[in-house]
């Protein structure tokens, strides 16, 4: 039990990273009477609009991060992004602060190398063949060993930034430059993956609570340039594929430990299920659960990290999501077409409230429910096509 926000008996959640996923986490926490603090590197981030208060700091600056957390003294520290000084989280955890799911999990998943080595080399789980490279010369060697096409990604990036397909050896320099441009924290290390021919990509939302591990129905998704553009639930897959996916997801999340929801990304191939990545937090493709499940991924995350039981997840209806992305740049913009999109049956729109636009930035999603996935996908994409981000040259 705990008291109201701002009281001596309040429970406090501090969010590191305040994007659209964090916004929904804050909303769910407030429904349970939790005091909320949103933190990000820029002002007016989406979650800051709904949190009780907010702070703007460089989250890669360990001293600034530690000073803020010691000042706020939260009951739980909830990372929403990878670009955080994770060694500081390790130190704070040693001081007695609770990091979700654990400081070790945050450190391992902050970049693609840590989690890939854990999954493939320590746990022996099936993955695409891969190499790491610290220079253009090493990248060319990796491309030679893996063959083309292959996929080049920065060790640390989000939403597909810096990711490219190397289709011939001569593309290596362009891929290297794209990776450097898209990397977070000025990283210069990349992972090179053998190209995987897959039937589909899925996210298996895996919930670790005080009562054990449960799985949400699988979510299918399509990515473009490494970033998701639509997702749907449930994804149709065989019982054997689902069992294999759940085995992989449980192995990875058990090793990471802690409480909360994990977005485990997997490839379904004719050779079996391959592990791709894991995020120890709600997943962008999982926003569809706001339309499909009795408890969304955000509600599940908050319940589990606060120590409440999570006994089951029920799929209420098939559903789908589709994204709205910006084309231009600027702070003076408007999203149009909301009335048209909301006129479609069983359809919702979530406008994230980001303070500025840039090409490819995700600004909103549509959510549609229907009697089957195919109809839900059609409606969600139709609704998204009705929305536009209009950028103005001058403040309107």
Region annotations inferred by a language model:
Residues 303-396:
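Peripheral (often C-terminal) accessory segments that flank ATP-dependent C-N-forming ligase machineries
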Residues 243-264, 269-270, 279-331:
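Active-site "cap" helix and flanking loop/linker of ATP-utilizing ligase/carboxylase catalytic domains
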């Amino acid at each position: 039990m705990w008291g109201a926000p701002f009281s001596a008996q309040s429970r406090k959640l501090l969010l590191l990273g305040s994007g659209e996923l964090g916004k929904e986490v804050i909303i769910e926490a407030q429904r349970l009477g939790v005091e909320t603090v949103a933190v990000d590197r820029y002002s007016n981030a989406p979650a800051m609009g709904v949190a009780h208060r907010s702070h703007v700091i460089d989250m890669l600056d360990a001293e600034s991060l530690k000073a803020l957390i010691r000042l706020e003294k939260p009951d739980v520290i909830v990372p929403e992004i990878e670009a955080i000084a994770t060694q500081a989280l390790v130190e704070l955890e040693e001081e007695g602060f609770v990091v979700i799911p654990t400081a070790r999990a945050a450190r391992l998943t902050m970049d693609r190398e840590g989690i890939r080595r854990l999954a493939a080399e320590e746990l022996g789980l099936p993955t695409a063949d891969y190499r790491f490279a610290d220079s253009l010369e090493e990248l060319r060697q990796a491309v030679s060993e893996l063959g083309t096409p292959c996929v080049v990604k920065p060790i640390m990036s989000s939403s597909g930034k810096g990711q490219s397909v190397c289709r011939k050896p001569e593309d290596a320099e362009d891929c290297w430059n794209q990776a450097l441009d898209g990397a977070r924290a000025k990283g210069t290390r990349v992972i090179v993956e053998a190209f995987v021919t897959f039937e589909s990509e899925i996210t298996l939302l895996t919930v670790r609570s005080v009562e054990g591990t449960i799985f949400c129905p699988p979510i299918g998704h399509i990515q473009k340039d490494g970033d998701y553009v639509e997702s749907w639930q449930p994804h149709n897959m065989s019982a054997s594929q689902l069992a294999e996916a759940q085995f992989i997801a449980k192995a990875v999340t058990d090793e990471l430990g802690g409480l909360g929801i994990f977005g485990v990304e997997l490839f379904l191939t004719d050779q079996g299920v391959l592990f791709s990545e894991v995020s120890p937090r709600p997943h962008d493709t999982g926003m569809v659960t706001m339309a499909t499940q009795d408890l969304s991924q955000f509600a599940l995350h908050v319940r589990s990290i606060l120590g409440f039981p999570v006994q089951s997840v029920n799929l209420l209806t098939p559903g789908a999501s589709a994204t709205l992305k910006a084309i231009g740049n600027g702070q003076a913009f408007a999203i149009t077409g909301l009335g048209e999109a909301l006129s479609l049956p069983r359809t919702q729109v979530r406008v994230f409230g980001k303070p500025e636009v840039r090409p490819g930035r995700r600004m909103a999603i549509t959510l549609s429910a229907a009697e089957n996935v195919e109809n839900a996908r059609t409606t969600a994409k139709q609704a998204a096509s009705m929305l536009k981000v209009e950028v103005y040259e001058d403040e309107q």
